[in-house]
């Protein structure tokens, strides 16, 4: 998806290895739809992906995955990162958002700010940055301590 963000857990081995780190809801809402590797979080909880803000999580594993109709609050565990659902080169979560049915770019007029981290497109796909409080990290396609961030910190 154009404008999506990818986050990979710290895993010891294997491109599609299981992760013990959970994916959490970025906001309060209702799980409006699930499919193989997919969770849709409807922030206005009306169950309609065409209205209001909706968050897409892609590559969510089937183990302990939130179910359609679940109401969640920000920070609620909703599943585990995986390679399920679509094409994937390794265990990660792909997160994007829609407003009234239209995909909204992460680095656009309304940036996709997560816990103060603001995304910026790179010169090529998958080489963007996140900036918070004057600190910038650059996306990495290999496990790198310098690109490590943790929700809630």
Predicted feature locations:
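Short glycine/threonine/proline-enriched tight-turn/helix- or strand-capping micro-motif at secondary-structure
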Residues: 1-26
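Catalytic cores of extracellular degradative/oxidative enzymes
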Residues: 5-12, 64, 70, 76
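Short beta-turn/strand-loop junction motif enriched in small, turn-promoting residues
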Residues: 12, 28-30, 44, 80-84
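Acidic, glycine-rich catalytic/binding loops that coordinate metals and/or anionic ligands
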Residues: 13, 17, 67-73, 96-153
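Zn2+-dependent peptidoglycan hydrolase active-site motif and core
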Residues: 18-68, 89-97
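Short hydrophobic beta/alpha edge segments that flank linear recognition/processing sites
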Residues: 39, 72-87
């Amino acid at each position: 998806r154009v404008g999506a963000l990818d986050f990979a857990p710290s895993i010891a081995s294997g491109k599609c290895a299981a992760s013990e780190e959970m994916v959490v809801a970025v906001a309060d809402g209702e799980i409006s739809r699930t499919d193989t590797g997919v969770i849709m979080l409807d922030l206005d909880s009306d169950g309609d992906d065409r209205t209001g803000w909706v968050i897409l999580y892609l590559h969510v594993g089937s183990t302990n995955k939130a179910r359609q109709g679940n109401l969640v609050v920000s920070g609620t565990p909703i599943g585990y990162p995986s390679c399920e659902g679509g094409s994937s080169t390794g265990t990660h979560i792909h997160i994007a958002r829609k407003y009234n049915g239209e995909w909204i770019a992460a680095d656009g007029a309304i940036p996709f700010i997560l816990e103060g981290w603001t995304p910026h497109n790179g010169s090529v796909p998958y080489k963007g940055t996140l900036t918070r409080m004057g600190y910038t990290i650059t996306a990495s396609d290999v496990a790198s301590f310098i690109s490590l961030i943790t929700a809630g910190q």
